[in-house]
Amino acid sequence: NLFDACVEKAVNGFVNAGVPMEKLILGVPFYSRKWDGVKGAGCRNGLGMEAETVGGYGGDYGELKESWIGKRGFIRYWDEQAKVPYLFDGETFISYEDCESLGVKIAYLKEKDMGGIMFWEYKCDPSGELLSFIKKNM
């Protein structure tokens, strides 16, 4: 079910299929996903709302830091269920990873004794902020 995806369900699916926990690697993106034409935003700040587009690439972390986070009317919010930040300006929704969300994921994989973490892709973190965080906390 691609519409109810989450890390825990994926991990449990592999473990239930016989894959040892220490063989599982958690993948995280250094890029964002963006939806335009988000409708009926109201008090939910765009979270879970219908959009005019199916979503697509929203820029890498470096671009977000440079031009989007706290700029152009975008406000950073936190999705408590998914444990990730997102940006919303009343019409455009951008979901991404940052050091806070990486911290949650690193704590999870350590708790579960998973094999490690991987990211895609190196050039999407030109300042090295995310990579340095991973290195320091793994």
What are these regions (language model features)?
Residues 1, 91-95, 119:
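Second-shell loop/turn segments in exported
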Residues 2-39:
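Active-site region of glycoside hydrolase catalytic domains
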Residues 3-11, 98, 102-105, 130, ...:
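Stable alpha-helical elements in mature extracytoplasmic
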Residues 15, 110-113:
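Non-catalytic positions within long, well-ordered alpha-helices that form the structural scaffold/packing
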Residues 26, 109, 117:
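Conserved, mostly hydrophobic/aromatic
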Residues 28, 121-123:
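Active-site proximal loops enriched in glycine and acidic residues that flank catalytic Cys/His/Asp
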Residues 28-108, 137-138:
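Glycan-binding loop/region signatures in secreted carbohydrate-active enzymes
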Residues 108, 123-138:
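Aromatic-rich peripheral "rim/lid" segments of glycoside hydrolase catalytic domains that contact
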